[in-house]
Curated annotation (Swiss-Prot):
Primary site of residence: membrane
Glycosylation site positions: 192, 208
Region span, Interaction with GRB2, ERI3 and SYN1: 25-241
Native source organism of the sequence: Antilope cervicapra
Membrane topology of the entry: Lipid-anchor; GPI-anchor
Function: Its primary physiological function is unclear. Has cytoprotective activity against internal or environmental stresses. May play a role in neuronal development and synaptic plasticity. May be required for neuronal myelin sheath maintenance. May play a role in iron uptake and iron homeostasis. Soluble oligomers are toxic to cultured neuroblastoma cells and induce apoptosis (in vitro). Association with GPC1 (via its heparan sulfate chains) targets PRNP to lipid rafts. Also provides Cu(2+) or Zn(2+) for the ascorbate-mediated GPC1 deaminase degradation of its heparan sulfate side chains.
Stretches the record annotates as Disordered: 28-119
Gene3D superfamilies: Prion/Doppel protein, beta-ribbon domain (1.10.790.10)
Protein name from the UniProt record: Major prion protein
Bias (Gly residues) ranges: 55-105
Leader sequence residues: 1-24
Entry binding sites for Cu(2+) 3: 88-90
UniProt binding sites for Cu(2+) 4: 96, 98-99
MF terms in GO: copper ion binding
């Protein structure tokens, strides 16, 4: 009986000590925090003073120490102590004390340099480029190519081409190959739309093409359209082969069996 009483008292003492330690940990430390001697807000100028409410022994509405609307200690709208809108003590937008909104204090966060604005000319240019392709009735723009070296049969045209090849397109417009019955139809349509589009766009910029330019441009674009057709045909057949492979019954059964093993 005595041992049970002793054990109970030891348990009570342990719980009391544990509770006291927990309360000590939760007690605020002196010198910092909200409404204590240390300043937490960056906008304070007077040492040891806070903004909400001011220190000095007074409470809200007291004649000394700073209350709401009091002549001493610094309250809301007071001439001393540094309150909201005061000339001293460092409040919101104040010339002294530092750290207010737009002030010379070292902790101001409102004077950061503004982020650079998006260049709207670049955005508009990108949108316009997308509209050109979309406005051609389903035509796609191929990737850039190196302009082919072509011989035209005489030295004058060969030299003229080498000197002016940079004026000719290095990309072609085309539709998907499955919309054409053969390569000739694809190339014919590709050459017409590419030469027309390049001529109209370049003429709008103030540059004109001669008959020699058109002749050479058609030869250059024709070679690039043939290359584009070969690329698209190869990719099209590869996609078709993949679909046929994965749609065959043996492959479907194998995939189903593997899924069954993984899930099961």
């Amino acid at each position: 009986m005595v041992k049970s009483h002793i054990g109970s008292w030891i348990l009570v003492l342990f719980v009391a000590m544990w509770s006291d330690v927990g309360l000590c940990k939760k007690r605020p430390k002196p010198g910092g925090g909200w409404n204590t001697g240390g300043s937490r807000y960056p906008g304070q100028g007077s040492p040891g003073g806070n903004r909400y409410p001011p220190q000095g022994g007074g409470g809200w509405g007291q004649p000394h120490g700073g209350g709401w609307g009091q002549p001493h200690g610094g309250g809301w709208g007071q001439p001393h102590g540094g309150g909201w809108g005061q000339p001293h003590g460092g409040g919101w937008g104040q010339p002294h004390g530092g750290g207010g909104w737009g002030q010379g204090g070292t902790h101001s966060q409102w004077n950061k340099p503004s982020k650079p604005k998006t260049n709207m000319k670049h955005v508009a240019g990108a949108a316009a480029a997308g509209a050109v392709v979309g406005g051609l009735g389903g035509y796609m723009l191929g990737s850039a190519m190196s302009r082919p070296l072509i011989h035209f049969g005489n030295d004058y045209e060969d030299r003229y081409y080498r000197e002016n090849m940079y004026r000719y397109p290095n990309q072609v417009y085309y539709r998907p190959v499955d919309q054409y019955s053969n390569q000739n139809n694809f190339v014919h349509d590709c050459v017409n739309i590419t030469v027309k589009q390049h001529t109209v766009t370049t003429t709008t910029k103030g540059e004109n093409f001669t008959e020699t330019d058109i002749k050479m441009m058609e030869r250059v674009v024709e070679q690039m359209c043939i290359t584009q057709y070969q690329r698209e045909s190869q990719a099209y057949y590869q996609r078709g082969a993949s679909v046929i492979l994965f749609s065959s019954p043996p492959v479907i059964l194998l995939i189903s069996f593997l899924i069954f093993l993984i899930v099961g």
